[in-house]
Amino acid sequence: MLQSLAGSSCVRLVERHRSAWCFGFLVLGYLLYLVFGAVVFSSVELPYEDLLRQELRKLKRRFVEEHECLSEQQLEQFLGRVLEANNYGVSVRSNASGNWNWDFASALFFASTVLSTTGYGHTVPLSDGGKAFCIIYSVIGIPFTLLFLTAVVQRVTVHVTRRPVLYFHVRWGFSKQVVAIVHAVLLGLITVSCFFFIPAAVFSVLEDDWNFLESFYFCFISLSTIGLGDYVPGEGYNQKFRELYKIGITCYLLLGLIAMLVVLETFCELHELKKFRKMFYVKKDKDEDQVHIIEHDQLSFSSITEQAAGMKEDQKQNEPFVATPSSACADGPANH
């Protein structure tokens, strides 16, 4: 008997705090996923980093031995200055000195990466005035960009997602949930083809040092707003029509970001995903509780009004009776 009562009480406790339990498992799963990613990246990339470090040490030692007139300290200073300039997007190589980082097309590309929070990091402001303006520009521009993207995605979703699903549901009588799932999958495949596979093939042709995997990697890193900056298009030597190429990349990134958000919004509107998300949310107050609160307020208000009316009646009863002129006129002829 006690075991059954304890079991039922535990079940009721779990059901009552189901959202909190689900949220706790969500946090734990996210932390485990972070640790899993760290373990995989470390095990895969650490050997390559070690090989690169050994290769650089050998190359540096060989260079110092071949150039005895140059001390190791002077070489360190030179390399430090070169790496510092490279962090600002300025390369010391002769074949890269012709590309300017702050012409109009490059500045437009930089502004788009700042507002979309992609931030490749290959080009950064050099002056203090540029850094200050970048802060002010981002503070105003990022919320403006979010507002712009929200409005565009809402309008596109109506025409691309909601109306087609409603048309097939009303016109052909298909189940709305089934139509929504099929539509979301097809829209995702079309978006991946148009904004990942096709652009990756184009970049692998236009960029001399990129293969298809590296081009696809750039497309994904850019449209997901990760923006690592290890691959940036239009930075090659003697890039043809570089300004037009940069403007085209800016348009591609903006349209691709909108397409990604439309696909995410389409999947988020699926009934199954809505039910799944609600498992981790804090439950809202039930309508019955709100009705009880309103009824309680009404009862308290009515009790106050009744008390006020009772006080007025008592006050009238305690006052002395005074005949009004109308009552006197009314009683006069009768008595006469």
Swiss-Prot record:
The keyword Calcium is assigned to this record: no
Tissue: Expressed in renal distal tubules, especially in cortical collecting duct and cortical thick ascending limb, with lower levels in the connecting tubule.
Assembly description: Homodimer; disulfide-linked. Heterodimer with KCNK2; disulfide-linked. In astrocytes, forms mostly heterodimeric potassium channels with KCNK2, with only a minor proportion of functional channels containing homodimeric KCNK1. Interacts with KCNK3 and KCNK9, forming functional heterodimeric channels. Interacts with GNG4. Identified in a complex with PSD and ARF6; interacts only with PSD that is bound to ARF6. Interacts with UBE2I.
Protein name listed in UniProt: Potassium channel subfamily K member 1
Lineage summary: Eukaryota, Metazoa, Chordata, Craniata, Vertebrata
Post-translational modification comment from the UniProt entry: Sumoylation is controversial. Sumoylated by UBE2I. Not sumoylated when expressed in xenopus oocytes or mammalian cells. Sumoylation inactivates the channel, but does not interfere with expression at the cell membrane. Sumoylation of a single subunit is sufficient to silence the dimeric channel. Sumoylation of KCNK1 is sufficient to silence heterodimeric channels formed by KCNK1 and KCNK3 or KCNK9. Desumoylated by SENP1; this activates the channel. Desumoylated by SENP1; this strongly increases halothane-mediated activation of heterodimeric channels formed with KCNK9.
Known catalytic reactions: K(+)(in) = K(+)(out); NH4(+)(in) = NH4(+)(out); Na(+)(in) = Na(+)(out); Rb(+)(in) = Rb(+)(out)
GO biological process: chloride transmembrane transport; glutamate secretion; potassium ion transmembrane transport; regulation of resting membrane potential; sodium ion transmembrane transport; stabilization of membrane potential
Organism encoding this protein: Oryctolagus cuniculus
Membrane-crossing residue ranges in chain numbering: 21-41, 133-156, 182-202, 244-267
All ranges on the Extracellular side of the membrane: 42-103, 123-132, 203-211, 232-243
Protein purpose: Ion channel that contributes to passive transmembrane potassium transport and to the regulation of the resting membrane potential in brain astrocytes, but also in kidney and in other tissues. Forms dimeric channels through which potassium ions pass in accordance with their electrochemical gradient. The channel is selective for K(+) ions at physiological potassium concentrations and at neutral pH, but becomes permeable to Na(+) at subphysiological K(+) levels and upon acidification of the extracellular medium.
Name of the gene: KCNK1
